[in-house]
Amino acid sequence: MEMNKVLHQDLVQATRRILKLGPSELRVTDAGLICKNPNYSVCDAMLKTDTVYCVEYLLSYWESRTDHVPCFIFKNTGCAVSLCCFVRAPVKLVSPARHVGEFNVLKVNESLIVTLKDIEEIKPSAYGVLTKCVVRKSNSASVFNIELIAFGPENEGEYENLLRELYAKKAASTSLAVRNHVTVSSHSGSGPSLWRARMSAALTRTAGKRSSRTASPPPPPRHPSCSPTMVAAGGAAAGPRPPPPPMAAGSWRLCRCEACMGRCGCASEGDADEEEEELLALAGEGKAAAAAAGQDVGGSARRPLEEHVSRRRGVSTHHRHPPSPPCAPSLERTGYRWAPSSWWRARSGPSRPQSGPWLPARFATLGPLVLALLLVLALLWRGHGQSSSPTRSAHRD
């Protein structure tokens, strides 16, 4: 791998970080010079005495980044020990007779070349060992000792035992963590589980109520006047009937039920019906009197009366709308007999009861008075017609 500025900068920063050097403890060679001649040292570090440096880790990092066999040279300058870092080991410095041990003595201007292979040779175990170096001052003047200390097991058997212990501790910690997680989850899930049980019970009760309601669906809604009512044999209602809904504003239809007792506007309608019946009765008597006298009872004589009756009913004589179809007749139970309801009787016309003349129930006590009044009015109308007949004949002549 060719040296470039990016790789040069990365190696310098890694060296300063791993060896924990300050700004003044590392001298860096220019990147352009290193790119032209890779045999120059990339950097020189001034090492302190009695300080542990991770030399094996730094060599492994440089080898992985450069794809070469890096080389570190410890050199005694007389007052301190410098560490020169090379990407490639200089040929003139590398001699086959050199020897690197755990304890090395450096005199003035002497150097010690250390590679990754040398460190692996002095390791007590090939696995689980990290070698570090320490610079110590010797008893002699200007002499330093370089110690390569292997941190780890003493042999392969101890390394395997250490691995078994580490794996056992890891498995125990993992199982304990899983057990604690399950316990915490069970304790924290007690509240939601109780809530789920209550919710399921509530949903079951709601479903039961809905099924009981849907088992027998209610009959389709009908108009209040068409609903069947249980009555006794005498014709009186067995129980109080609920009042019908209020009439819509502007509606010309009025309720014709006989059991509301004027709560929905039937009283005014009953008065209007009485007036219409009286007017029609008077018109019939007048027509009979005119026919007996041999007079013409054409359209001019009965048109004002019909217009008056039509105005009372709220329907124009020139624009008559077809009557709305009545709803289906409902039946009322009268003892053991079934009869149409009061609304149907009012729509379809007067139906004769079991006994007595046809009159509304509320006018049963006023029957004789009404008959007497009608008789008096008929007599008065007849006398008026007889008195006005000579005048009409004189006008004709």
From Swiss-Prot:
Residues 382-397 are nuclear. Plays an essential role in virion nuclear egress, the first step of virion release from infected cell. Within the host nucleus, NEC1 interacts with the newly formed capsid through the vertexes and directs it to the inner nuclear membrane by associating with NEC2. Induces the budding of the capsid at the inner nuclear membrane as well as its envelopment into the perinuclear space. It holds the Pfam family Herpes_U34. Keywords: Host membrane, Host nucleus, Late protein, Membrane, Phosphoprotein, Transmembrane, Transmembrane helix. Residues 205-245, 291-332 are annotated as: Disordered. Residues 310-322 have a biased composition (Basic residues). Forms a heterohexameric complex with NEC1. Interacts with host UBA7 and RNF170; this interaction promotes UBA7 proteasomal degradation. The keyword DNA-binding does not apply. HAMAP family: HSV_NEC2. Belongs to the herpesviridae NEC2 protein family. It is a single-pass membrane protein. Residues 1-358 are perinuclear space. It comes from the Viruses. This is Nuclear egress protein 2. The modification Phosphoserine is found at S216. The chain crosses the membrane at residues 359-381. Phosphorylated. Phosphorylation by viral kinase UL97 at Ser-216 plays an important role for correct viral nuclear egress complex (NEC) localization. InterPro entries: Herpesvirus_viron_egress-type.
